[in-house]
Amino acid sequence: PVQPAGQQLLVEMMESTEDIPAKCLEESIDWNWETFPEYMDSISDGNYALDIGVQIPHAAVRFYVMGERGARNEPATPADSDEMARIVAESLREGALGFSFSRTKAHTYLDGWQPGTLSGIEELNPIAEAIAQEGGAPIMFSPRGVTGLYPSEREGEIELAAELSRTSCSPVMMCLIQHSQDPEEWKSVLDLFEAVSASGVKVFGQVTGRSIVTLGGFSTKFNPFMHGEDWPLLSHLSNSEIAHKIESDPTLRNRLIEGAESTRNLWQSRKFFEDMTYPLIPLGETSPQYEPFESIAAISERTQKNPLEVMLEVLCSHDGNGLLNYPHYNYADGNLDAVHEMLRHPNSRLGLSDAGAHLETLS
C-alpha cells in the first residue's frame, strides 16, 4: 500500500536498498493503486512470462499507516500496530503469500534506515496474531547482521523468530549466509534453529543456492579504481572511451594502479590476492569460470603482473565492458560446499534470491 504523497519515498527506498535506478521506476510504474487489494488488481491486468507471487511488506505498510513517523522509525503506538495488523490480514485474504520485514541496518535510504528496521516484538506481535487468525502464512525477514548472525545478536534474532512463529502458528524464515569473517558460524546458527524447533515452533534458515556477489566495472557503482584522483576525469565517459584512454596512455594506467594501491578498498583485500581458494573472478563475454585457477590472484601469479594491473586489463576488455565478480558470501572456501550442507539441514529452505532486483549485486 502507498499513500499518493508517499510514492517518491518508496521509489527512493527501492533505489537505495534494491539498487534499481529511480528513473527506471518513475518512468515504468503506473501509480493506479493505493491499497494492497488495488495493487493486486493492478498487476493482475498485465501479461507476464512468469507467475507472480506477492508478499505484504512491513516497510510499506508501516509508512502507509504512520507516514513520516514510520519513515523516521519512531515507535508504533498500539493503534498503529492494530492498523498494520488489519492491513496485513486484509492482504492475506486478497492473495498475499506471506509477510516480510527487515531488521538489517544494511538496508538504508536517504539518511537513515528503511521503515521498520528498529521494530521489535511489541509492533510485530499484533501482526503475527492477525496472521494466525487468517489461518497462518509464511513470515520472512532479514535479521540483524544479515551477512551472518553475529554472536551478540543471533540468539535474540532467533528468539524473535521463534516468538513470531509461536504467535502466528506459521513458519518463520530468516536469511542464513556463510560470511568470510566467520566461515563456520552458520553451523552454530542451524544448531540454534534446531534447539528452538524442539519446542514446537517452525524456524528455518533461508539459503540462496549460489554465492552472493557484487559486479564491478566502469559503469557500476563500485570498481577498484574509483577512489583514485584520476577516476573523476574518466567517470563521465562511455565504457569504450574509458578503455581507449587507459590502453593508449601508459602513464594514466600506471597512475590508476598507484591510486588504487594507496586507497585500499574491498577489492584489494589480501585474501583475494593471496588465498587462491577465494577467487575474484573476471567476467567477459563467455560464461564465467569460478574455479580458483581463473581468479585474479591465479592470473597474477601466472603472468607475474600486479593484481591491480590484471583487474584493469579485465575492465578494459570487451570494449570497456569487462566485469569483476566479487563474492561476498557463501564462497569463503572457494566452493559451494557450505551451501550444500546448509540445504541438507532440515531447518533450512532454498530461497533468498533477489530475482533481478539488484542491478549489481546477484544472489
Task: Give, region by region, the residue ranges found by the protein language model.
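C-terminal substrate/ligand-recognition segments
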Residues: 311, 331-363
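Generic recognition of flexible, low-complexity loop/linker segments
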Residues: 87-88, 127, 161-162, 192-193, ...
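Structural motif
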Residues: 50-54, 97-98, 137-139, 171-173, ...
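Glycine-rich tight-turn/loop motif centered on a GG-T
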Residues: 9-28, 32, 69-79, 110-120, ...
